[in-house]
Amino acid sequence: MLSGHGSRIIGVVLGFSYAHGMQSLQDPFVGELIGTIQMETEENGYYVMLIGGESIQNVVDIASKWNVEGLLILGYNEEQYRSLSRRLNKKMILIDAYPEGAYTFQNVGIDDYSGGYQIGEYLYSCGYKKALFVAETERDSDYYRWMGFKQAMEKQGGFCSRSRYIVIPGKRNLRLRKYRELLPRFLEAKALAFSSDYNAIEAINFFFDEGIMVPEQISVTGYDDSVYASMIRPKLTTVHQDIPQKAHVALERLMKLIQGETLNELNIKNPVYLVKRDSVKE
């Protein structure tokens, strides 16, 4: 075991064990992010230690025992970060964290609001003025994507009520049951904006099994532009975020902190853009 200064170990804290009802590392976004961090870290002569972060004490124990030089943290909220930083004096960069107020910690994320706005604006321009927004939570990135979507839907003077924000269960079997229950409403709305590619692709497969055609009967959009977005048929219209770039920026900033540099900007918000493919009927 390495001790003292200069362990050259970077801890990657994963704050959730499950995503979409499966192990979090099975999620395309998480896998690509952590895979990029691992490759770039080793290119810099460091090593990656993956740490389960649901127990803050577990992070404290492992990071202290192995004397990690810094932490990249995915899936923590402000309260969890505060609790960890009180117990552990390490350099930390959070990824996709959302405080209640202004940022007081180092974070690397994306412009979730803009992505939601771009999707909402596009669907509205295609005539889907009653499109629904579908997500697994009502917080963090899901919430900001909804706010952008809502703003775009209302820019022509209309009203996008909270009832158009559909929250679906985290477990797959319960989600599919919810899709079946909401099918009449989905068909009436004619367009669904999902807060992740994973859920959008899952829904397209569900509709196919039910004999419902995408986009002829229901238009579907995702968010992230994962590797699977262009593999499914129809190819998924989605919001592209540069996941390798997010990983690169987070690691680059952590290395600067480790080397004693001061970072003036607290929140780095990487841009996103709409990718039009075949899952929306224009």
Language-model segments: what does each one mean?
Residues 25-43, 115-118, 140-160, 202, ...:
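Short, solvent-exposed amphipathic alpha-helices that sit
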Residues 117-157, 266-280:
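An alpha-beta-alpha
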Residues 11-12, 68-75, 132-135, 165, ...:
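Periplasmic-binding protein-like
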Residues 38-52, 132, 150-175:
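Short beta-strand elements in bilobed, periplasmic/extracellular small-molecule ligand-binding domains
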Residues 107-133, 172-180, 200, 241-259:
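Hydrophobic alpha-helical segments within soluble ligand-binding/sensing domains
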Residues 1-8, 281:
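N-terminal helix-turn-helix DNA-binding module of bacterial transcription factors
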Residues 9-121, 182-186:
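Alpha-helical recognition/docking segments in bacterial nutrient-uptake
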Residues 179-282:
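Flexible loop/turn connectors
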